[in-house]
Amino acid sequence: MVKKALKKNSNNVTGPYDSLRHYMEAIETHGNVIRIKEIDQDAYELTGFIYKLLDKHGWLGAPSVIVEKIKISGEWVDGPIIINQYGMAGHEAMAIGVPLDEIKKGEHLHNYKKALNKMMEMGDITPIETTEIDKADAPSKDVILKEDEINILDFPFIQTNPGDNGRFINTGNLITVDPEQGRNVGTYRMQIKGPRKIG
């Protein structure tokens, strides 16, 4: 079942946001989210659906998609799975405070300048002091798994295409620390190679 989210109100809901949940709620408020109750990825239904969206709306016009339940390797797995959350023109600019109705689809230079001007209005970008809060009040780490409790295969990551060599974390944010080389932060497509191994 596919349902296009209805525009909840006409107010501009702009960032910055406290969490990915708040960001997705703002996108949904603008009617730019399609919710899918369940889909069979063993038959590559999600892959086909996303390609059809891109064909119809283009790379910068396709809405975000939230899948509530998905079939992976013969089993139905609860989501949500979020796809294309940053793909639609204007969403990233909206996240830094540019109202979505000021974003012009297809006018990338205009949109870039609009977002850049908004960043400049914010002044110098300086490091934010670390604030320590009690673990019970943390907005993340609702579930903490350690050592053998960790099983990446429990998460609804999918094999996106038939030619893939397995399931992948697509556009995952990866932070690594090397004792000699230091820290690296990047966005990568990472293959899941086991319960506690990605590469």
Stretches found by the model and what they are:
Residues 2-199:
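Extended, highly charged
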